[in-house]
């Protein structure tokens, strides 16, 4: 039998909150400013993907999902006790998107009719060494190019988006990209 003295956390669920995260939050924030937003992302054919689509549509966002039946929609759960994040549980498939899926994503980017394209890079299958150049090349001429890079906890480099009009690294991402752990924050931003 199991050792009864193993450390085991036990918490009682008082409530459960569900909301979209990642790139969907960026889209909702842009929409909240009054912008017209077209949203494309890689989703699984599952309840979490449907939840994201419904939530974004309810926010007035035009959603153009690329569904991959071979992977789940990314779901991140946190167990929070008295305001402290005690445990994170992620359902995520970080494998690079297949070529047919990547082609569909490239087509969606190329068909953008807005004034800006925002790439939210969380390294969950869309952005990788094989895809970034193809996705960047698909951005229509004249669009403001923004990279909302979130690669501090995963392999990635904001320099992949070096020719963009705006990139949004945090301090850790900037230091990694520049190979600079010693400068103050202001020189990093220059």
Where would I find each of the regions flagged by the language model?
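Ribokinase/PfkB-type carbohydrate-kinase core domain
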Residues: 1, 12-190
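Acidic-glycine-rich active-site phosphate/pyrophosphate-binding loop
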Residues: 1-7
